[in-house]
Amino acid sequence: MSDNKVEVDKRRTFAIISHPDAGKTTITEKVLLFGNALQKAGTVKGKKSGQHAKSDWMEMEKDRGISITTSVMQFPYGGALVNLLDTPGHEDFSEDTYRTLTAVDSCLMVIDSAKGVEDRTIKLMEVTRLRDTPIVTFMNKLDRDIRDPIELMDEVEDVLNIACAPITWPIGSGKEFKGVYHILRDEVVLYQSGMGHTIQERRVIEGIDNPELDKAIGSYAADLRDEMELVRGASNEFDHQAFLKGELTPVFFGTALGNFGVDHILDGIVEWAPKPLPRESDARMIMPDEEKFTGFVFKIQANMDPKHRDRVAFMRVCSGRYEQGMKMHHVRIGKDVNVSDALTFMAGDRERAEVAYPGDIIGLHNHGTIRIGDTFTQGEKFRFTGVPNFAPEMFRRIRLRDPLKQKQLLKGLVQLSEEGAVQVFRPLDSNDLIVGAVGVLQFEVVVGRLKSEYNVEAIYEGISVSTARWVYCKDERKLEEFRRKCSQNLALDGGDNLTYIAPTMVNLNLSMERYPDIEFAKTREH
């Protein structure tokens, strides 16, 4: 068996998706603790303690206690090498999150057991559906009062349209939380509070009918036996093939803050989640065990190091292997580049990567030549597909306090748009600059970064824009005519793509009726 195959088989690359405040950052911490990447979980954001979560590292994130940028962490667990892509959890950070989901092979969905399925979870699940990504589910916060577990699973099935197969089952909740029963292993793992910061041995009782169980948890043991009869009759059994197709999700219960149940999830991911999968390109399917190196960029991050105004392009390796100093072909610009200083990540701690395999994420230093969606190969000319831009949902006009810095403003905005922090539009008929985002917080981030990184003071003004669509037409003549007649609604985005800026949805619908040959697209392939 080749080295490459051994390494590929070891890899598991996944992201965590959840609604804000469902406990995603805490889970990330605890997962790293189990992977020995952290000695003591930095319980997230004790405001006074100065102990910040390892994966939240940009200044603004430290101030607010939210993860604004996707960071990447690699750690060994159970004979596998796990790559965890942390996704922005806050209300407003979704476009980056959407794109991160294109770089993983499976996802862990975290649900607050007191609340059930929430909006953001629904949106993110829609994105995972584009590629039928396998989903593992963790019902979190069992140390609080929760909704009925069967009701929670029914809601996941109804709202997210995915079958649930419970792997562990909770015994009590809130102050009466006693532990979980592991259905496949037929064992009860007992919960003790106050063990959230370190990994300690848990008491395990083998067998649901073991008299030891009655001694340990009293009448809860009989309740559990009755409940399991019901659960076995009413729920799905775990089916590995259905899981790999994205049709069924294994469900685990626990509390991330109490560091309980996290090892069960990791065991499940290592045992069941797919190793690095083949990827589609515009030429053919690229298999992970091919000899030649290929990869694509799914995110660009500015200033991971405040001392240097650098940018790092995050690349998912798809086939072959990266070796320090190798030559890569940058397909979009048709140039070969020597890469000797790619990085691996442990959230903000960068190390030079000597070698990387399919499923791994590496960082390339970028001085403005790399864009989101770029493909790198060892000479072959094709493009990986499926890394989209999403039409913004909110818009502002942006202008300078000091009009002499227009050039820096445009440069800053174009760079931030290439990175995916925001989208920028330049109307054909005016000198305005319009910024589009998927959520309000992105606007704040952009003004903050323009000031700290480009020394530009910018302010926003309201603008009557409802939505944007990328426009295409196979017939050049018809496109030119459309451009002439609708120029007051047209703009170029950061990559000079023609975009229709609609003041209202009614206006958009009328234009779509009036120009049936023009395609108005909600997403755009990079």
Curated annotation (Swiss-Prot):
Lineage: Bacteria, Pseudomonadati, Pseudomonadota, Gammaproteobacteria, Alteromonadales
Entry binding sites for GTP: 18-25, 86-90, 140-143
Residues in tr-type G domain copies: 9-277
Compartment annotation: Cytoplasm
GO cellular component: cytosol
UniProt xrefs under InterPro entries: EF-G-like_DII, EFG_III/V, G_TR_CS, P-loop_NTPase, PrfC, RF3_C, RF3_dom_3_sf, RF3_GTP-bd
Keyword field contains S-adenosyl-L-methionine: no
Molecular-function annotations in GO: GTP binding; GTPase activity; guanosine tetraphosphate binding; translation release factor activity, codon nonspecific; translation release factor activity, codon specific
Function: Increases the formation of ribosomal termination complexes and stimulates activities of RF-1 and RF-2. It binds guanine nucleotides and has strong preference for UGA stop codons. It may interact directly with the ribosome. The stimulation of RF-1 and RF-2 is significantly reduced by GTP and GDP, but not by GMP.
An example Gene Ontology biological process: regulation of translational termination
Family: Belongs to the TRAFAC class translation factor GTPase superfamily. Classic translation factor GTPase family. PrfC subfamily.
Protein's name according to its UniProt entry: Peptide chain release factor 3
Keywords assigned by UniProt, alphabetized: Cytoplasm, GTP-binding, Nucleotide-binding, Protein biosynthesis
